[in-house]
Amino acid sequence: MFPMRVIVETVRSQHCLTCSNEGHMITDTYAIVAGTTTLNQLVETVLAALGHSSMSTSARGLIQVNNWKPLPFDQITENLDDTVENLFKDISSHVVLKILSKPSTDSNSVQCISEVKNKLLKAAVNKNPNVLTNVDNQQVKDVINTIIAGDETLLNSEQIGAVNEWLDTLETNEDRRSPTQVQRFNTLYEIPRLDKWFKSDANPSKQKMNNYLSQLNQSPFRKNNSKISYQQICNWFTQKRSSSRTLAPVDLVQVSSAQTAAQLLPGFQLNLLQSLFGEQRQKFDFYDKLDETKIVGGSDSPSPADDEIHSNSDETIQDTLFSINIKPEPEIDSIASSPDMANSMRESLSSTSPKLLSGLDLGAFSTHSSSTNSMQNANSSVFSAARSRLMFDPLTELPVLEKWFEENPHPTWMQIDQYTQCLNNCAYRENYPHISQHNVKIWFKNRRAKCKRLLNGMQEKLEQKVFV
């Protein structure tokens, strides 16, 4: 006697027992086999020892050595009356006895299974009627209708091949479909109802969502189309809220800044015209006002810590807005900035094209028109603030920035806001994207880095000359 590994498997009723090499495993165990047992009695003896004697009537034995293909008994030896000891005793540790059995079913169970299959088929077709409408081959459509009706008519090989080909095409189209396909709501029956629900409650509760879902799925449109899931209607509300936030109006801080810019623009344009033509009228000295309007705690001296302070202040929304007062010319002359500033402005403006002078709109001195234009500029600056790179005009904007940098390399956040509004209200920015405070801050930061590089280069040259 010697041990042998035994695997018992069952084959489906629609499969052929003689053609199958594997099935559904029932047990995997070891059996002690007597050496005198013949090969043709091995399957019956082992099944009786394992308690599956009822399966021996429709059972078939296979011998598998290691991982090789299982072989039936008649392919191993021609003499089926030979003993197991002579055949497998020396290699019993490498041999597996695989027993395939086909369960015996009576006519009643077969009839019940066929009825269940027909019910499942009808339910699937009724659930998705588009399957039959998309069939182009009339022969395949007739065969499917015959099967659904429960007709026992036998099909020939041509009809079976046509049906199998259509099923393969259907599975291929399903595989190609995107797994994240978006459920399309009907624009005539469903979208108006969804919009109405969204206006009443943009963020409904789970109970409301389920109520909306049941109403949509019970509509006549969804009787012949796929039903909507809970996740799909949640995604619609999420996307609707996101789109409404994107189209939200400009906040009050930006509007207030735009109104302040409307007050600043007339004085700034008037100052430019009077500095060019020497008109003896009341004017507004912008540079002098920048020196007067400072924030407590800010620093005008160049220090490394200011970069972090100004970077943080750009991201903070401040409610305090600066005020501008127009003084008579005698008072301004007494506290005016250096004469080099006016000369530099005249030179920068004279070097530009005549379009700058023509672009200075004298009619903008009206308070109403200035406020309207500033509001439009503020709206456009909101959408253009996301630009990653912005070029300053080398003829009209860079000279002004250079002059501001000479006055204060580390401007406060209030000064940066004033600089931004002044640049955006120039004629050049009417046809180009508006500038943000971040752009001005980055320009000053890069300009300070450039000065530092120049100083380091000059020191290196001086050191080289000293050593030479």
From Swiss-Prot:
Lineage: superkingdom: Eukaryota
Consequence of gene loss (knockout): RNAi-mediated knockdown inhibits expression of hsp-60 when adults are exposed to conditions causing mitochondrial unfolded protein stress. Causes abnormal mitochondrial morphology. Drastically reduces the protein level of hda-1, possibly via ubiquitin-mediated degradation. Under conditions of mitochondrial stress, partially suppresses nuclear accumulation of lin-40 and lin-53.
Single GO molecular function: DNA-binding transcription activator activity, RNA polymerase II-specific
Post-translational modification comment from the UniProt entry: Sumoylated at Lys-327; sumoylation is required for cytosolic localization. May be desumoylated by ulp-4.
Segments for region (Disordered): 295-314
Limits of the CMP domain: 1-103
GO process terms (BP): chromatin remodeling; embryo development ending in birth or egg hatching; mitochondrial unfolded protein response; regulation of innate immune response; regulation of transcription by RNA polymerase II
Keywords linked to the UniProt accession: Cytoplasm, DNA-binding, Homeobox, Nucleus, Repeat, Ubl conjugation
GO cellular component: chromatin; cytosol; nucleus; transcription regulator complex
Cellular localization per UniProt: Nucleus; Cytoplasm, Cytosol
SMART domains recorded: HOX
PROSITE patterns reported for this sequence: CMP, HOMEOBOX_2
DNA-binding region positions on the chain: 179-248, 385-458
Chief place of localization: nucleus
Complexes and interactors: Interacts with ubiquitin-like protein ubl-5; the interaction occurs in a mitochondrial stress-dependent manner. Interacts with lin-40; probably associates with a NuRD (Nucleosome Remodeling and Deacetylase) complex via lin-40. Interacts with histone deacetylase hda-1.
Entry function: Transcription factor. Acts during mitochondrial stress by activating the mitochondrial unfolded protein response (mtUPR). Required during mitochondrial stress for the activation of genes involved in the mtUPR, in concert with histone deacetylase hda-1. In response to the citrate-induced mtUPR, positively regulates transcription of transcription factor nhr-80, thereby leading to modulation of lipid metabolism. May play a role in modulating the decline in protein homeostasis associated with normal aging. Required for embryonic development and maintenance of mitochondrial morphology.
Protein name in the entry: Homeobox protein dve-1
Source species of the chain: Caenorhabditis elegans
